[in-house]
């Protein structure tokens, strides 16, 4: 998948990410812009999770929504 496809996917799914993690701000979602590591980092930051817990949440979200980076 190229960068444009990933960016398009993210635009489609960022509302679902906001529903899942309501503490993420619009600025957070802009910074994340389809980058998995950024999503994990922002979840850690906003929710005080360890990296492993944030990774697990993101993995569950990816599986549930069939999201591909």
Swiss-Prot record:
Pfam families cross-referenced by the UniProt entry: CsbD
Top-level division of the source organism's lineage: Bacteria
Disulfide topology: none
Segments crossing the lipid bilayer: none
InterPro entries: CsbD, UPF0337_stress_rsp, YjbJ, YjbJ_sf
SUPFAM superfamilies membership: Hypothetical protein YjbJ
Protein family membership: Belongs to the UPF0337 (CsbD) family.
Identification of the protein by name: UPF0337 protein ECA0631
Species of the source: Pectobacterium atrosepticum (strain SCRI 1043 / ATCC BAA-672)
């Amino acid at each position: 998948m190229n960068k444009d496809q990933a960016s398009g996917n993210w635009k489609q799914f960022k509302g679902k990410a906001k529903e899942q993690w309501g503490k993420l701000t619009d600025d957070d979602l802009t910074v994340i812009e389809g980058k998995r590591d950024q999503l994990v980092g922002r979840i850690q930051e906003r929710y005080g999770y360890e990296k492993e817990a944030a990774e697990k949440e993101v993995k569950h979200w990816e599986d549930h929504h069939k999201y591909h980076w």
